[in-house]
Amino acid sequence: MNRIIIIVSFFMLASINIYSQNLTVVDVFEAVSKIDGFQEMDYVEDDIKFPVEIGTPKMIIHGNAEPREQVLRLLKNLPESSLVYDSTDERGKFDRIFINTIIYDLLYVHIGLGGNDTVLILFRGGNRKCIDEFIKDIRGFDY
């Protein structure tokens, strides 16, 4: 009987909800990529204009905004200081950029409304100076 309790306790600990952890931008990207309906897509530079120097992109897309709440719950577990850009319209559609300043991974998140796509692009291995300049340009000031 004690063995069963120990095994059950272990599995309960092992399945602790990812929504309750402190996450990195890579953790968020990987967790979102596992949400039903997300697909990895080729990043096409002509479609979305990000400087090449900010890193190697990996993009996932969901065909609508259905996973909005799940994505928002994950994003809330990033450090507040990681949010470096936020453009939210009056209806709640947004574009946000998060950064891990220790290793300079950058995460772009677009969430539309209703039938609009949900897009996440993770940039890794970018040039720190170029990332700083990019953020300064889009914000209009240093962060």
What is the role of each PLM region?
Residues M1-I4, Q21:
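Positively charged n-region of N-terminal signal peptides that target proteins for export
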Residues K58-Y108:
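Mature extracytoplasmic domains of secretory-pathway proteins
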Residues F98-K129:
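A short, solvent-exposed beta-edge/loop patch
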Residues I16-N22:
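Sec/Tat signal peptide C-region and signal peptidase I cleavage site
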Residues R128-Y143:
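Surface-exposed amphipathic alpha-helical segments
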Residues A31, R73-N77, F134-D137:
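Residues that form generic nucleotide/phosphate-binding pockets
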Residues N22-V71:
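Early exported N-terminus immediately downstream of N-terminal targeting peptides
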Residues I4-I16:
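Sec-dependent N-terminal signal peptides
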